[in-house]
């Protein structure tokens, strides 16, 4: 989608922002210059999901409160927009892959405890898992950029949908990661589900059943202790987000604050009070 068109629509829609939404999405001038929370989302009812075409990262903050979330969004987008980080990532791109040009932070409709950082333009081919993995690794060894003080986790998101369209989301995301295969040695996988201010609660059992049905029986098997692949599913506000990653536990569940400042990674999943334990 044309970002210039999106920006023009943003300007046109701004005067019609609902008063309640305007209040909920207010940030100070200091932050608005750095993180332009997408106004094309601000007037949408809280139950509307993130646009399905957005690719990026689910971001949580070290501290609670909207101010902390905004600061975390600033940090996450600044890391992704860092010149040297983009140079380092571009060096590992596949030939013909379209890179992202910038990272843009926005609220997740219906959830003010977390944020979303989208990679633009929307038709980029960036591997969000590789980006998040690189950030964790750089934080562990001490990157040139300022170490994160506000971001807790930066979880890759390949695609999102309404919370009621989980089945369609899994059908869209998983086939490229789990193609049919007849190898005698199965590839292991697990499913991790968590909730943050969900509009509706879903049990991990139900999510595992729906998502797991889109992984072929032949050539794959569930391993909850040491899976090669982890299907990450995040339910925040009215949005269901999904990605497939490797080494989820080894990467500390993408907690970059912990990677930067703590030597020993915890086995618990960081997040808000409503987050469910890993499956």
What does each model-identified segment do?
Residues 1-279:
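SAM-dependent transferase fold signal centered on methyltransferase-like domains
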